[in-house]
Amino acid sequence: MQKIRKGDKVVMLAGKDKGRTGEVVQVMPKEDRAVVRGVNVVKRHQRQTQTQEAGIINKEAPVHLSNVAIIDKDGKPTRVGFKVVDGKKVRVAKRSGEVIDG
């Protein structure tokens, strides 16, 4: 089970976008990376194809999972733990002890 999933609200802990928040768009567990909307935006040169024009586009690049933290209910970053509730493994916020999903 992953600690950070698609749709989670996260905050950046390090890097050029430190302190910025966004929603996880994609998680790549094998690479330990995630794509966060509005964070780590880079410019990419797009070659012209039959369907697309040539030009420079802005695109979100993946960030390492160690540089993001889930935002708790009070708006502060928290670590994630696991707990078994009713025979089901759920994610729990270490800061408040609340179940994140379930």
UniProtKB/Swiss-Prot annotation:
The record's listing under InterPro entries reads: KOW, Rib_uL2_dom2, Ribosomal_uL24, Ribosomal_uL24_KOW, Translation_prot_SH3-like_sf
SMART domains reported for this sequence: KOW
Q: State if Membrane is listed as a keyword.
A: no
- Transmembrane: is it a keyword of this entry? no
* GO biological process terms on file: translation
Instruction: Tell me the SUPFAM superfamilies matching this sequence.
Output: Translation proteins SH3-like domain
Subunit composition and interactions:
Part of the 50S ribosomal subunit.
Instruction: Quote the function comment for this protein.
Output: One of two assembly initiator proteins, it binds directly to the 5'-end of the 23S rRNA, where it nucleates assembly of the 50S subunit. One of the proteins that surrounds the polypeptide exit tunnel on the outside of the subunit.
Which family does the entry's similarity section mention? Belongs to the universal ribosomal protein uL24 family.
Name the record gives this protein: Large ribosomal subunit protein uL24
